[in-house]
Amino acid sequence: MIKNPKVLILTAHYGNGHVQVAKTLEQTFRQKGIKDVIVCDLFGESHPVITDITKYLYLKSYTIGKELYRLFYYGVEKIYDKKIASWYANFGRKRLKLLLQAEKPDIVINTFPIIAVPELKKQTGISIPVYNVLTDFCVHKIWIHREVDRYFVATDHVKKVMVDIGVPAEQIVETGIPIRSSFELKINPDIIYNKYQLCKNKKILLIVAGAHGVLGSVKELCQSFMSVPDLQVVVVCGKNEALKQDLVGVQETNPDALKVFGYVENIDELFRVTSCMITKPGGITLSEAAALQVPVILYKPVPGQENENAMYFERKGAAVVIRDDSEVFAKTEALLQDDMKLLQMKEAMKSIYRPEPADHIVDTILEENHVEPNHIPIKSPALAQSFT
């Protein structure tokens, strides 16, 4: 039995999702009394210049580099076993060896497909349990390695795909993707309406624009949606200050019809009162939408994991996928007017959702390593406490 295990969580800053999952797992371990938890961006610390370049190319995949990213994602999938694995396995290895020697972790968790640890296990024979937490509703071969002890996946569909390509079923646990604990609390919606100055008798369209430019014509769309009766449009611009300033002028023409925000810390509050949401199909965003049963409109998914996520939610009836700019307004307006369709999408989201995935993952890891959790109560947010 390990009395006070040290946990190393490896991640990468490609989008915010992988890091957010790492932080959620870190918080969950700490809630259960495991204090020695380290989160490390292995690639960023090992090769900062290469990482910055690849992050730039990743962000460009939202605008000019979609075909390039398609070739990378699906091309690597086909040739990975033959040509890529040996190079990728050594990426970050020097930094990793120093990290393992200095910290001596008892458990290693990957929230990004980093195979340096399992490859090191294979080559040196070191004994350390390795867990991969997949952060999308699909699986790429780059996640899979014989020396990984267990995989935590979003759905039974992902598990079946992995079994089909040779991963033993007993090594795969369907838990859902870890999301922030705030998405699993109960909150009185009346307080949210008051906080954001929203009318509870009107439908709400939430557009999560963010820094990467989910929509190319947000301003024009907002102007069109503002003419729809009994509709409020809420736009979250994230850290895109230029977009926010551009929309503030539009908001001033009719502040009751359009609300513009920058970065919203407690974005779950807006998820709770929205009728549907336009967003990009990241695995964490979709998991959060499923937790709160928010119908989603997925705009122009980037080829690769985002497209795979979008197709899964579309097949399940939880999302409308739009691939053409000219269809955004008409299809969104039609959905907002179709209460039966919205209800069906909410039910589909409910069927996808897996409750408390972070707890499930952490409890499984602690149990397998014979650690008795010591739960530390965490104070709930004020809005959650006000639920009646």
Swiss-Prot record:
EC numbers on record: 2.4.1.315
Q: Give me the gene this protein comes from.
A: ugtP
The record's listing under Pfam families reads: Glyco_tran_28_C, MGDG_synth
User: If you read the UniProt record, what top EC class would you report for this enzyme, in one word?
Assistant: transferase
- Catalytic activity from the UniProt record: a 1,2-diacyl-3-O-(beta-D-glucopyranosyl)-sn-glycerol + UDP-alpha-D-glucose = a 1,2-diacyl-3-O-(beta-D-Glc-(1->6)-beta-D-Glc)-sn-glycerol + UDP + H(+); a 1,2-diacyl-3-O-(beta-D-Glc-(1->6)-beta-D-Glc)-sn-glycerol + UDP-alpha-D-glucose = a 1,2-diacyl-3-O-(beta-D-Glc-(1->6)-beta-D-Glc-(1->6)-beta-D-Glc)-sn-glycerol + UDP + H(+); a 1,2-diacyl-sn-glycerol + UDP-alpha-D-glucose = a 1,2-diacyl-3-O-(beta-D-glucopyranosyl)-sn-glycerol + UDP + H(+)
Protein name, please? Processive diacylglycerol beta-glucosyltransferase
Q: Organism source for this protein?
A: Bacillus thuringiensis (strain Al Hakam)
Q: Please give the GO cellular component terms listed in this UniProt entry.
A: plasma membrane
User: What SUPFAM superfamilies does the record point to?
Assistant: UDP-Glycosyltransferase/glycogen phosphorylase
* Location of the protein in the cell: Cell membrane
Q: Which GO terms of type biological process are on file? A: enterobacterial common antigen biosynthetic process; glycolipid biosynthetic process; lipoteichoic acid biosynthetic process
Q: Does the keyword field hold Transferase? A: yes
Which InterPro entries has this protein been placed in? Diacylglyc_glucosyltr_N, Glyco_trans_28_C, Glycosyltransf_28_UgtP, Pro_diacylglycrl_glcsylTrfase
Annotated function: Processive glucosyltransferase involved in the biosynthesis of both the bilayer- and non-bilayer-forming membrane glucolipids. Is able to successively transfer up to three glucosyl residues to diacylglycerol (DAG), thereby catalyzing the formation of beta-monoglucosyl-DAG (3-O-(beta-D-glucopyranosyl)-1,2-diacyl-sn-glycerol), beta-diglucosyl-DAG (3-O-(beta-D-glucopyranosyl-beta-(1->6)-D-glucopyranosyl)-1,2-diacyl-sn-glycerol) and beta-triglucosyl-DAG (3-O-(beta-D-glucopyranosyl-beta-(1->6)-D-glucopyranosyl-beta-(1->6)-D-glucopyranosyl)-1,2-diacyl-sn-glycerol).
Q: Which domain of life is it from?
A: Bacteria
